[in-house]
Amino acid sequence: MTKTMLRALRGETLPTPPIWLMRQAGRYLPEYRATRAEAGDFLSLCYNPELAAEVTLQPIRRYGFDAAILFADILLLPQALGADLWFETGEGPRMSTITDMAGVEALKGKDEIHEKLAPVYETCRILARELPKETTFIGFAGMPWTVATYMIAGRGSKDQAAAHKLKDTDRPAFEALMDRITEATIEYLSKQVEAGCEVVKLFDSWAGSLKGQDFEDFAVAPAKKIIAELKARHPGLPIIAFPREAGEGYIGFAEKTGADCVAIDNSVSPEWAAENVQKGKSCVQGNLDPKYMITGGDELVQATKRVVEAFRNGPHIFNLGHGITPEADPENVTLLIETIRGK
């Protein structure tokens, strides 16, 4: 019996879609909050293989999801490249900034990242041993544009203005940074696969702010390069791409990049995504609005059924359109799973 998640990624249409949730290991779970407190802070948790493996396993024990995703953060890679990274309470991540070619050239090379990231690979090895045999293990990284937005601005921002400014005013420095991140991402994900990940997911959280040719050059092209290299090194490796809020850019994204599955956010309707992206044959992942994990009740049941129904004629992995939030009720996740699996 092949894992349901892998079957969907190979293009099978299943009677019940496999399910996992972005940020399924997170602050909505009391056991996660306890383990994070034990670690001391978020980054300490990411770099502690035993505790990072534990929080990855917690939602699998509680809910029996079809997949587990490595507990880490997309900003561990820029930290390994030499950027300073810290988290401010209530404010999120902060980083040192890169604003010119000198800053890019000061970064470490792609082969120098592994010492800092060694604990992440150890987490992968632990999970490859300890996950239930029916659970698919997903590794991940941020995509170059999204990672670059943090490295340029030093923080998350609503409009990614600093990254757009560098792109438009110092294209050589911007492209050099994108190339550095792209090369390092390939090495990072390759090591995750060697350490036991069965699938990798590429998170381009800010892809939606790239328009027209910029989307092709800085969302599509890096994804294509990363996917081609990973598949050359690891034949048969399934890859999920998530160009969040791409809108019309979702159409043809899998074909252009070589991704096996495109994750869809909830800014588009499941019916639109089924007609334009899935088309009865391409694997899609998504796309329930995370708000229903807070509100629950019949609204959650009906919205869940709508997503399942929209995608039932092609390969589908059920997920949210974005990460589950700290305000979510763990009981609503149980209701979600029961609705999908017909319990």
UniProtKB/Swiss-Prot annotation:
Source organism, top-level taxon: Bacteria
Key word Cytoplasm present: yes
SUPFAM superfamilies: UROD/MetE-like
Pfam families: URO-D
GO BP: protoporphyrinogen IX biosynthetic process from glutamate
Site (Transition state stabilizer) residue list: D73
GO function terms (MF aspect): uroporphyrinogen decarboxylase activity
A single GO cellular-component term on record: cytosol
Database matches in HAMAP family: URO_D (MF_00218)
Role played: Catalyzes the decarboxylation of four acetate groups of uroporphyrinogen-III to yield coproporphyrinogen-III.
Subunit-level organization: Homodimer.
Family per similarity comment: Belongs to the uroporphyrinogen decarboxylase family.
Name of the molecule in the record: Uroporphyrinogen decarboxylase
Gene name of the encoded protein: hemE
